[in-house]
C-alpha cells in the first residue's frame, strides 16, 4: 500500500503550486455523459480518484485521452447505463452518475458508493429529488436500479441539508430534464459554482449558483464544451497548514485565496502571518501556534476536509482548542493515530478537545482517509524523530506529488512503495 517516511523538524520554505480541484473535476467529467461528442477539461489533477472516474466512464462507454493536465472525453451515442461495484465501492463521488444516466438513458444501475468511510452518508436526498423528477428506484443485492420511463421532468426540490453531492446530481439531471428544476437549500460550494459554469458552457441554463436557490432549465440541445477546472482549495489549505505547523514560510501559487476566507482567518487567529493576492497566498508560521476553536460547516464555513490538518496544527499549540465536527460522524477516526505520536486529544460526541503539547514524537501510523492521511504527514513534519505513514493510497486519491512538493520546500521526506 506504500509508505511515506518523514524525519521531522525541518522548517518549510519555498513555493508550491496547486492543481485543479478534485471535487470539481470529478463531477465535470461526469457531465460528459449528458451529450455525445468530444469534451475537453483543462487543469485536471493527476490523482487516483480522477483515474477511477475515468475507469467508470470507460465502463459506461466513453473514451478518454489525457495529455498533461488536459483531459478529453468522447461520449458515445449509446451508453451502458451501469456503474459496477468494483469501481463504485472505491469512490463515493461515483453516485453522481445516477442523475445523468437517468436523464440520458432513462435507466441506471449503480452500486452503492464507497470511498472514505466517514460514517453515515445517506443518499436519500439524491433519490428523493430524482423521484420528484419522475424516477423510480429499487435496491437489489446492493445495486440501485433506477428508471425514468417517461424521462425526467423539472420539479421544485427542497433539500433537508445543503448536500453537495445531491445538489450536483440534481443539477446534472436537471439540465437534461424537461422544464425547470428549482433546488432549494442548495449547496453553495465553489465547486458547485464551477460545475454550473461548465454546464452553461455546454449550453445549459443554470442560475443562482453560489446561493441557496438554484434554477436549472432543461436544454434539449446541449453540446460538448471546453472548460478549465478551478484550483483545489483543499490542496492549497493543506500546504498553508504545512507552512504553519513547521513555523515555515510557504507561498502557495495557482490558488484562489478568496475561497479559503474562513480557514485563513483561523490561521491568523493561530498566530500565522497571512498575505495573499489574486492567485497566491503566503503563510509565515509562528514558533508555536496559539490555541483556537472552530466549527465545520457547509461553505462558506470552515471546510470539514481541512479539519484534520488543522487539528494536527493544534496538537502543538500553546493551550487548549475545541473543534466541533458537524458534517461527518466518523471524521475523528484519525485521532488515535495522532495520539500514538503523543497528541493529547479527547473526543466528546462531535467535539474534540485538543490540549497542545510542545512537541510530537515520530512513530508508525496509518492513514484512514485522504485528509486524515495528509494530517498525519503534517504532524510528522513537526514531530521529533521519524514518522512512517502507511496506507498512503488514501493520500494518492486527493494529492498529486505531495512528497515531491514538500521535499522541494525542505522537508526530509521520502516515499517507499
What are these regions (language model features)?
Residues 1-417:
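Short, structured segments at the rim of ligand-binding sites
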Amino acid at each position: 500500500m506504500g509508505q511515506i517516511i518523514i524525519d521531522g523538524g525541518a522548517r518549510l520554505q519555498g513555493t508550491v503550486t496547486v492543481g485543479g480541484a478534485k471535487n470539481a473535476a470529478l463531477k465535470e467529467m461526469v457531465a460528459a455523459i449528458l451529450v455525445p461528442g468530444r469534451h475537453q477539461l483543462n487543469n485536471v489533477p493527476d490523482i487516483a480518484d480522477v483515474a477511477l472516474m475515468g475507469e467508470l466512464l470507460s465502463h459506461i462507454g466513453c473514451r478518454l485521452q489525457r495529455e498533461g493536465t488536459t483531459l478529453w472525453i468522447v461520449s458515445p451515442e449509446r451508453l451502458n447505463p451501469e456503474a459496477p461495484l468494483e469501481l463504485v465501492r472505491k469512490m463515493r463521488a461515483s453516485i453522481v452518475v445516477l442523475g445523468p444516466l437517468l436523464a440520458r438513458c432513462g435507466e441506471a444501475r449503480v452500486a452503492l458508493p464507497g470511498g472514505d468511510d466517514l460514517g453515515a452518508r445517506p443518499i436519500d436526498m439524491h433519490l428523493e429529488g430524482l423521484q420528484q423528477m419522475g424516477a423510480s428506484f429499487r435496491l437489489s443485492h446492493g445495486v440501485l436500479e433506477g428508471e425514468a420511463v417517461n424521462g425526467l421532468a423539472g420539479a421544485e426540490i427542497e433539500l433537508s441539508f445543503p448536500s453537495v453531492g445531491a445538489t450536483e446530481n440534481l443539477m446534472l439531471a436537471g439540465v437534461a430534464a424537461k422544464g425547470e428544476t428549482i433546488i432549494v437549500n442548495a449547496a453553495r460550494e465553489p465547486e458547485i459554482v464551477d460545475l454550473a459554469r461548465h454546464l452553461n458552457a455546454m449550453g445549459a441554463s443554470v442560475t443562482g449558483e453560489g446561493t441557496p436557490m438554484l434554477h436549472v432549465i432543461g436544454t434539449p440541445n446541449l453540446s460538448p464544451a471546453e472548460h478549465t477546472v478551478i484550483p483545489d482549495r483543499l490542496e492549497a489549505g493543506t500546504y498553508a497548514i504545512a507552512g504553519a505547523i513547521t513555523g515555515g514560510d510557504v507561498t502557495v501559487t495557482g490558488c484562489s485565496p478568496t475561497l479559503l476566507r474562513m480557514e485563513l482567518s483561523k490561521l491568523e487567529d493561530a498566530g500565522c502571518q497571512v498575505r495573499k493576492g489574486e492567485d497566491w497566498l503566503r503563510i509565515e508560521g509562528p514558533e508555536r501556534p496559539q490555541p483556537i476553536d472552530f466549527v465545520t460547516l457547509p461553505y462558506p464555513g470552515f471546510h470539514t476536509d481541512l479539519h484534520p490538518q488543522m487539528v494536527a496544527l493544534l496538537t502543538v499549540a500553546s493551550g487548549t482548542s475545541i473543534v466541533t465536527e458537524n458534517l461527518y460522524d466518523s471524521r475523528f477516526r484519525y485521532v488515535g493515530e495522532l495520539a500514538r505520536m503523543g497528541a493529547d486529544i479527547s473526543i466528546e460526541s462531535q467535539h474534540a478537545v485538543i490540549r497542545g503539547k510542545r512537541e510530537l514524537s515520530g512513530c508508525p501510523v496509518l492513514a484512514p482517509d485522504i485528509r486524515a492521511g495528509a494530517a498525519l504527514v503534517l504532524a510528522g513534519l513537526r514531530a521529533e524523530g521519524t514518522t512512517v505513514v502507511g496506507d498512503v493510497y488514501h493520500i494518492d486519491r486527493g494529492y498529486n506529488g505531495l512528497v515531491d512538493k514538500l521535499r522541494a520546500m525542505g522537508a526530509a521526506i521520502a516515499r517507499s512503495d
